A protein has these predicted regions:
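Well-ordered alpha/beta subsegment
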Residues: 93-114
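Amphipathic, interaction-prone secondary-structure segments
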Residues: 41-75
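Negatively charged, low-complexity tracts enriched in Asp/Glu with abundant Ser/Thr
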Residues: 7-49
Length: 114
């Protein structure tokens, strides 16, 4: 697992996907700090890593990245158990708030480079 604060190469994500799940890389994005953790077996592992580094839990959102779909809407999948947060109004594994989805998308687009 690693925390991405600057950029990560798409080729690195492709290697992670091949070594773990085949087509996807799990990631957790901190929308407050504009960083993400990648490469964990579970979103909860990445969430714990970011929490240990001082990220506030309410700003952490789990996604899946599909490197082969880079540049398309299918690159980011909003699906994680850590996203179920009734107190924040998010009752699904997805991210229901459009502003949060936009923030996650913007951060991922900034951090992942071809």
């Amino acid at each position: 697992m690693q925390i991405v604060q600057e950029t990560i190469a798409l080729s690195t994500l492709e290697q992670m996907a091949a070594g773990m799940f085949g087509t996807l890389v799990k990631a957790v994005v901190d929308i407050e700090q504009g960083i993400m953790a990648v490469g964990g077996e579970m979103h909860a592992d990445e969430e714990a890593l970011l929490l240990d580094e001082g990220s506030p839990q309410p700003s952490l959102w789990g996604i899946n990245l599909y490197p082969a779909q880079f540049g398309t809407p299918r690159f980011i999948e909003f699906d994680s158990m850590i996203n179920i947060r009734p107190r924040q109004g998010n009752r699904t594994r997805s991210v229901d708030d459009a502003a949060v989805r936009a923030a996650v998308t913007s951060i991922v687009e900034r951090l992942v480079s071809r």
